[in-house]
Curated annotation (Swiss-Prot):
May help in the organization of the PsaE and PsaF subunits. It is a single-pass membrane protein. Keywords: Chloroplast, Membrane, Photosynthesis, Photosystem I, Plastid, Thylakoid, Transmembrane, Transmembrane helix. GO terms for biological process: photosynthesis. The chain crosses the membrane at residues 8-28. Belongs to the PsaJ family. This is Photosystem I reaction center subunit IX. It comes from the Eukaryota. It is found in: Plastid, Chloroplast thylakoid membrane. Gene3D superfamilies: Single helix bin. GO terms for cellular component: chloroplast thylakoid membrane; photosystem I. InterPro entries: PSI_PsaJ (IPR002615), PSI_PsaJ_sf (IPR036062).
């Protein structure tokens, strides 16, 4: 069972969802502490 679970975690949709969740959280926290950084270069 452990082999199937690690194979499931290494699939592209799971890695994509985890990566997008991390990226969204990072941008949200960056925007919370530095609200003008995202719009500075526009």
């Amino acid at each position: 069972m452990n082999n199937n679970f690690t194979k499931y975690l290494s699939t592209a949709p799971v890695i994509g969802v985890l990566w997008m969740t991390f990226t969204a959280g990072f941008i949200i926290e960056l925007n919370r502490f530095f609200p003008d950084v995202l719009y500075f270069y526009l």
